[in-house]
Amino acid sequence: TIESCTCDYKFRGDSGNDWEWGGCSDNADFGHRFGKKFVDSGEKGRDLRHAMNLHNNEAGRKTVSSEMRRECKCHGMSGSCTIETCWMRLPTFRTVGELIKERFDGASRVTMRNDGSPSDRETESSFVPYNPSHKQPASRDLVYFENSPDFCERNDKFGTPGTRGRECNATSLGVDGCDLMCCSRGSTTTEIKVKERCSCTFHWCCKVKCEECTSFRTVHRCL
Protein backbone atom coordinates (compact mmCIF):
# COMPACT_ATOMS: atom_id res chain seq x y z
CA THR A 1 0.00 0.00 0.00
CA ILE A 2 0.98 3.66 -0.35
CA GLU A 3 1.32 5.15 3.13
CA SER A 4 0.00 8.56 2.09
CA CYS A 5 -3.16 7.00 0.61
CA THR A 6 -5.66 6.95 3.45
CA CYS A 7 -9.38 6.27 3.40
CA ASP A 8 -11.59 8.76 1.60
CA TYR A 9 -12.97 10.64 4.59
CA LYS A 10 -15.51 12.70 2.67
CA PHE A 11 -17.82 9.70 3.02
CA ARG A 12 -18.39 9.99 6.78
CA GLY A 13 -21.26 10.41 9.22
CA ASP A 14 -25.02 10.37 8.71
CA SER A 15 -26.20 10.01 5.13
CA GLY A 16 -29.69 11.28 5.89
CA ASN A 17 -31.21 7.94 4.86
CA ASP A 18 -31.70 4.60 6.67
CA TRP A 19 -27.96 3.98 6.68
CA GLU A 20 -24.80 5.90 7.57
CA TRP A 21 -21.31 6.18 6.17
CA GLY A 22 -18.65 4.08 7.86
CA GLY A 23 -15.77 1.77 7.18
CA CYS A 24 -12.97 2.76 4.83
CA SER A 25 -14.04 4.09 1.43
CA ASP A 26 -11.52 3.63 -1.38
CA ASN A 27 -9.73 6.88 -2.08
CA ALA A 28 -10.43 7.26 -5.78
CA ASP A 29 -9.50 10.95 -5.76
CA PHE A 30 -6.00 10.14 -4.54
CA GLY A 31 -5.67 7.40 -7.14
CA HIS A 32 -6.84 9.77 -9.86
CA ARG A 33 -4.29 12.43 -8.90
CA PHE A 34 -1.46 9.93 -8.47
CA GLY A 35 -2.27 8.15 -11.73
CA LYS A 36 -2.45 11.44 -13.61
CA LYS A 37 0.91 12.56 -12.25
CA PHE A 38 2.58 9.21 -12.89
CA VAL A 39 1.14 8.21 -16.28
CA ASP A 40 0.86 11.63 -17.90
CA SER A 41 4.37 12.75 -16.95
CA GLY A 42 5.86 11.17 -20.08
CA GLU A 43 3.57 13.08 -22.45
CA LYS A 44 5.53 16.26 -23.11
CA GLY A 45 4.64 16.96 -26.73
CA ARG A 46 1.93 19.15 -28.20
CA ASP A 47 1.09 17.11 -31.28
CA LEU A 48 -1.95 14.96 -31.95
CA ARG A 49 -0.40 11.75 -30.64
CA HIS A 50 0.39 13.25 -27.24
CA ALA A 51 -3.04 14.90 -27.03
CA MET A 52 -4.62 11.55 -27.88
CA ASN A 53 -2.61 9.74 -25.19
CA LEU A 54 -3.54 12.33 -22.55
CA HIS A 55 -7.21 12.12 -23.49
CA ASN A 56 -7.25 8.31 -23.37
CA ASN A 57 -5.37 8.28 -20.05
CA GLU A 58 -7.97 10.58 -18.54
CA ALA A 59 -10.82 8.56 -20.05
CA GLY A 60 -9.50 5.48 -18.26
CA ARG A 61 -9.26 7.28 -14.94
CA LYS A 62 -12.77 8.67 -15.28
CA THR A 63 -14.10 5.21 -16.08
CA VAL A 64 -12.63 3.86 -12.84
CA SER A 65 -14.05 6.71 -10.74
CA SER A 66 -17.50 6.57 -12.34
CA GLU A 67 -17.87 2.86 -11.58
CA MET A 68 -17.43 3.14 -7.81
CA ARG A 69 -20.23 1.39 -5.94
CA ARG A 70 -21.63 1.57 -2.44
CA GLU A 71 -21.14 -1.50 -0.27
CA CYS A 72 -22.93 -1.93 3.04
CA LYS A 73 -22.85 -4.12 6.12
CA CYS A 74 -25.66 -4.72 8.60
CA HIS A 75 -25.16 -4.61 12.37
CA GLY A 76 -27.58 -5.87 14.98
CA MET A 77 -28.55 -8.74 17.22
CA SER A 78 -29.40 -12.12 15.66
CA GLY A 79 -28.68 -10.98 12.14
CA SER A 80 -31.04 -8.00 12.26
CA CYS A 81 -30.14 -4.85 10.38
CA THR A 82 -30.59 -2.28 13.13
CA ILE A 83 -27.66 -0.27 11.85
CA GLU A 84 -26.29 -0.32 8.33
CA THR A 85 -22.94 1.24 7.55
CA CYS A 86 -21.76 1.80 4.00
CA TRP A 87 -18.61 2.75 2.14
CA MET A 88 -17.54 3.31 -1.47
CA ARG A 89 -15.62 0.55 -3.24
CA LEU A 90 -13.64 0.68 -6.47
CA PRO A 91 -14.69 -1.62 -9.32
CA THR A 92 -12.73 -4.81 -9.90
CA PHE A 93 -9.98 -4.97 -12.52
CA ARG A 94 -12.19 -7.26 -14.60
CA THR A 95 -15.05 -4.76 -14.55
CA VAL A 96 -12.78 -1.91 -15.59
CA GLY A 97 -11.13 -4.05 -18.25
CA GLU A 98 -14.47 -5.02 -19.78
CA LEU A 99 -15.61 -1.39 -19.86
CA ILE A 100 -12.37 -0.21 -21.44
CA LYS A 101 -12.62 -3.02 -24.01
CA GLU A 102 -16.13 -1.85 -24.93
CA ARG A 103 -14.86 1.70 -25.39
CA PHE A 104 -11.90 0.41 -27.38
CA ASP A 105 -14.25 -1.39 -29.77
CA GLY A 106 -16.23 1.84 -30.21
CA ALA A 107 -13.29 4.27 -30.28
CA SER A 108 -13.68 7.46 -32.33
CA ARG A 109 -11.25 8.45 -35.06
CA VAL A 110 -10.30 12.11 -34.65
CA THR A 111 -8.03 14.78 -36.04
CA MET A 112 -6.70 18.06 -34.65
CA ARG A 113 -8.75 21.22 -34.97
CA ASN A 114 -7.97 23.48 -37.91
CA ASP A 115 -6.50 26.12 -35.61
CA GLY A 116 -3.51 23.87 -34.85
CA SER A 117 -2.28 22.60 -31.50
CA PRO A 118 -4.79 22.54 -28.64
CA SER A 119 -4.70 25.31 -26.08
CA ASP A 120 -5.89 22.92 -23.38
CA ARG A 121 -4.54 19.38 -23.67
CA GLU A 122 -6.84 18.07 -20.96
CA THR A 123 -10.13 18.44 -22.82
CA GLU A 124 -11.69 16.60 -25.69
CA SER A 125 -12.21 19.96 -27.48
CA SER A 126 -8.68 19.45 -28.85
CA PHE A 127 -10.18 17.11 -31.44
CA VAL A 128 -12.79 17.03 -34.16
CA PRO A 129 -14.22 13.82 -35.61
CA TYR A 130 -12.37 12.53 -38.67
CA ASN A 131 -15.79 11.95 -40.21
CA PRO A 132 -17.74 15.25 -39.96
CA SER A 133 -21.01 13.34 -39.65
CA HIS A 134 -19.89 11.70 -36.41
CA LYS A 135 -20.48 13.27 -33.01
CA GLN A 136 -17.78 14.82 -30.87
CA PRO A 137 -16.13 12.20 -28.59
CA ALA A 138 -17.09 12.48 -24.92
CA SER A 139 -14.61 12.69 -22.08
CA ARG A 140 -14.80 8.93 -21.39
CA ASP A 141 -14.64 7.88 -25.05
CA LEU A 142 -11.38 6.51 -26.42
CA VAL A 143 -9.96 8.17 -29.53
CA TYR A 144 -7.41 7.35 -32.23
CA PHE A 145 -6.03 9.26 -35.21
CA GLU A 146 -4.82 6.57 -37.59
CA ASN A 147 -5.95 3.07 -38.43
CA SER A 148 -4.02 0.07 -37.15
CA PRO A 149 -1.88 -1.82 -39.67
CA ASP A 150 -3.38 -4.88 -41.35
CA PHE A 151 -2.44 -7.67 -38.96
CA CYS A 152 -3.80 -10.29 -41.37
CA GLU A 153 -0.83 -9.99 -43.73
CA ARG A 154 2.87 -9.98 -43.00
CA ASN A 155 4.29 -6.47 -42.63
CA ASP A 156 8.02 -6.24 -42.00
CA LYS A 157 7.82 -2.47 -41.50
CA PHE A 158 5.63 -2.87 -38.43
CA GLY A 159 7.03 -6.25 -37.42
CA THR A 160 3.72 -8.09 -37.79
CA PRO A 161 4.02 -11.70 -39.02
CA GLY A 162 0.47 -12.00 -40.33
CA THR A 163 -1.77 -14.97 -39.66
CA ARG A 164 -0.96 -17.29 -42.58
CA GLY A 165 -0.01 -20.69 -41.21
CA ARG A 166 -1.27 -19.88 -37.71
CA GLU A 167 -3.10 -22.65 -35.88
CA CYS A 168 -6.70 -21.72 -35.19
CA ASN A 169 -9.75 -23.11 -33.39
CA ALA A 170 -12.46 -24.22 -35.82
CA THR A 171 -15.20 -24.20 -33.17
CA SER A 172 -14.42 -20.86 -31.50
CA LEU A 173 -16.25 -17.61 -32.22
CA GLY A 174 -13.52 -15.62 -30.47
CA VAL A 175 -10.28 -14.11 -31.73
CA ASP A 176 -8.67 -17.58 -31.79
CA GLY A 177 -11.37 -18.88 -34.13
CA CYS A 178 -10.53 -19.66 -37.73
CA ASP A 179 -13.11 -17.20 -39.10
CA LEU A 180 -11.52 -14.20 -37.40
CA MET A 181 -7.87 -15.23 -37.24
CA CYS A 182 -7.71 -16.28 -40.87
CA CYS A 183 -9.31 -13.01 -42.02
CA SER A 184 -11.92 -14.87 -44.12
CA ARG A 185 -9.21 -16.59 -46.20
CA GLY A 186 -10.20 -20.05 -44.96
CA SER A 187 -8.12 -22.74 -43.30
CA THR A 188 -6.69 -26.20 -43.87
CA THR A 189 -7.46 -29.28 -41.79
CA THR A 190 -4.90 -32.02 -41.20
CA GLU A 191 -4.50 -35.02 -38.92
CA ILE A 192 -1.16 -35.16 -37.14
CA LYS A 193 0.41 -37.88 -35.02
CA VAL A 194 1.35 -36.75 -31.54
CA LYS A 195 3.61 -38.59 -29.11
CA GLU A 196 2.87 -37.90 -25.47
CA ARG A 197 3.85 -39.23 -22.08
CA CYS A 198 1.10 -41.30 -20.50
CA SER A 199 0.40 -43.82 -17.72
CA CYS A 200 2.87 -42.06 -15.46
CA THR A 201 3.61 -43.61 -12.06
CA PHE A 202 5.66 -42.44 -9.11
CA HIS A 203 8.46 -44.71 -7.89
CA TRP A 204 10.02 -44.36 -4.43
CA CYS A 205 12.20 -42.45 -4.30
CA CYS A 206 12.03 -40.17 -6.33
CA LYS A 207 11.25 -40.83 -9.96
CA VAL A 208 8.26 -40.60 -12.25
CA LYS A 209 8.17 -43.19 -15.00
CA CYS A 210 5.90 -42.83 -18.01
CA GLU A 211 5.02 -44.71 -21.12
CA GLU A 212 4.96 -43.11 -24.55
CA CYS A 213 1.57 -43.00 -26.21
CA THR A 214 0.68 -42.04 -29.75
CA SER A 215 -2.50 -40.18 -30.58
CA PHE A 216 -3.92 -38.30 -33.52
CA ARG A 217 -5.01 -34.66 -33.37
CA THR A 218 -6.91 -32.51 -35.84
CA VAL A 219 -5.09 -29.27 -36.60
CA HIS A 220 -6.54 -26.26 -38.41
CA ARG A 221 -4.20 -23.65 -39.93
CA CYS A 222 -4.93 -20.39 -41.69
CA LEU A 223 -4.46 -20.16 -45.45
Curated annotation (Swiss-Prot):
<comment type="similarity">
    <text>Belongs to the Wnt family.</text>
</comment>
<feature type="disulfide bond">
    <location>
        <begin position="198"/>
        <end position="213"/>
    </location>
</feature>
<dbReference type="GO" id="GO:0005109">
    <property type="term" value="F:frizzled binding"/>
</dbReference>
<dbReference type="InterPro" id="IPR005817">
    <property type="entry name" value="Wnt"/>
</dbReference>
<feature type="disulfide bond">
    <location>
        <begin position="72"/>
        <end position="86"/>
    </location>
</feature>
<keyword id="KW-0449">Lipoprotein</keyword>
<dbReference type="InterPro" id="IPR043158">
    <property type="entry name" value="Wnt_C"/>
</dbReference>
<feature type="compositionally biased region" description="Polar residues">
    <location>
        <begin position="125"/>
        <end position="135"/>
    </location>
</feature>
<feature type="disulfide bond">
    <location>
        <begin position="74"/>
        <end position="81"/>
    </location>
</feature>
<dbReference type="GO" id="GO:0060070">
    <property type="term" value="P:canonical Wnt signaling pathway"/>
</dbReference>
<keyword id="KW-1015">Disulfide bond</keyword>
<keyword id="KW-0325">Glycoprotein</keyword>
<keyword id="KW-0964">Secreted</keyword>
<dbReference type="GO" id="GO:0005615">
    <property type="term" value="C:extracellular space"/>
</dbReference>
<keyword id="KW-0879">Wnt signaling pathway</keyword>
<feature type="disulfide bond">
    <location>
        <begin position="182"/>
        <end position="222"/>
    </location>
</feature>
<dbReference type="InterPro" id="IPR018161">
    <property type="entry name" value="Wnt_CS"/>
</dbReference>
<feature type="disulfide bond">
    <location>
        <begin position="152"/>
        <end position="183"/>
    </location>
</feature>
<dbReference type="GO" id="GO:0005125">
    <property type="term" value="F:cytokine activity"/>
</dbReference>
<protein>
    <recommendedName>
        <fullName>Protein Wnt-1</fullName>
    </recommendedName>
</protein>
<feature type="disulfide bond">
    <location>
        <begin position="200"/>
        <end position="210"/>
    </location>
</feature>
<dbReference type="Pfam" id="PF00110">
    <property type="entry name" value="wnt"/>
</dbReference>
<feature type="lipid moiety-binding region" description="O-palmitoleoyl serine; by PORCN">
    <location>
        <position position="78"/>
    </location>
</feature>
<feature type="region of interest" description="Disordered">
    <location>
        <begin position="110"/>
        <end position="135"/>
    </location>
</feature>
<feature type="glycosylation site" description="N-linked (GlcNAc...) asparagine">
    <location>
        <position position="169"/>
    </location>
</feature>
<comment type="function">
    <text>Ligand for members of the frizzled family of seven transmembrane receptors. Probable developmental protein.</text>
</comment>
<feature type="disulfide bond">
    <location>
        <begin position="7"/>
        <end position="24"/>
    </location>
</feature>
<keyword id="KW-0272">Extracellular matrix</keyword>
<dbReference type="GO" id="GO:0030182">
    <property type="term" value="P:neuron differentiation"/>
</dbReference>
<feature type="disulfide bond">
    <location>
        <begin position="205"/>
        <end position="206"/>
    </location>
</feature>
<dbReference type="GO" id="GO:0045165">
    <property type="term" value="P:cell fate commitment"/>
</dbReference>
<feature type="disulfide bond">
    <location>
        <begin position="168"/>
        <end position="178"/>
    </location>
</feature>
<keyword id="KW-0217">Developmental protein</keyword>
